[in-house]
Amino acid sequence: MLDILVIAPHPDDAELGAAGTILRFKDEGARVGVLDLTSGEPTPFGTPEKRAAETAAATAILGLDWRENLGLPNRSLEPTLEARRALAVVLRRVRPRWLFAPYWVDAHPDHVAATQLVEAARFWSKLTKTDMPGEPWHPQRIFYYYCVHLKQAAQPALVLDISPYWERKLAAIRCYHSQFIEGRPTTPPTFLDQLRDEAAYWGKVIGKAYGEPLASREPLGLASLRDLV
């Protein structure tokens, strides 16, 4: 049983948008998993073998308790009934308390489809009188992380302080050499420079060194305002 399940369209999306959150939860003793929906291949400089090795290296840095790939088609991901059932079965098996999915507005069709799929599968996972294996389960909440392909100003519901975890987040992202280093321009600002600037911006917003924005479709409750940074 997992406390947190981060669902990613491709291997590297969870690292880009939620690695700081993952590392913080792990540091607090939570059981955290990642489900990649597709292999992420083909890409210009990647291969299935290379991407799998990169994912394994990033997984080790994050210290994940569980990671699997659902094996859905890259570049043509759709929230079909078959895909919904497959994801709902996983949710009934690993029984996460909270889900993390990509932000719902994106230029990448796979990302948009992934979010629609997560929301539908979350509902299906609680169904009774079904031929799906496993006992019914309904994750309490969905948070949305930003790994978008749009130049837009994010409007998060909260920003998590990831200052102690930034360097490890960057190390996990660097594992995907075929995606973020190979074939990329080396003149500043590099892609990784831009990621650092973005995290620093969100850190500044909350008075910290680095931050990770998260969105929610539903209101968030606090036990006490003392929990605010």
Each language-model region and where it sits:
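Metal-dependent de-N-acetylase/amidase catalytic core
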Residues: 1-7, 78-229
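Active-site rim/loop-helix segments in enzyme catalytic domains that contact anionic ligands
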Residues: 1-94, 215, 227
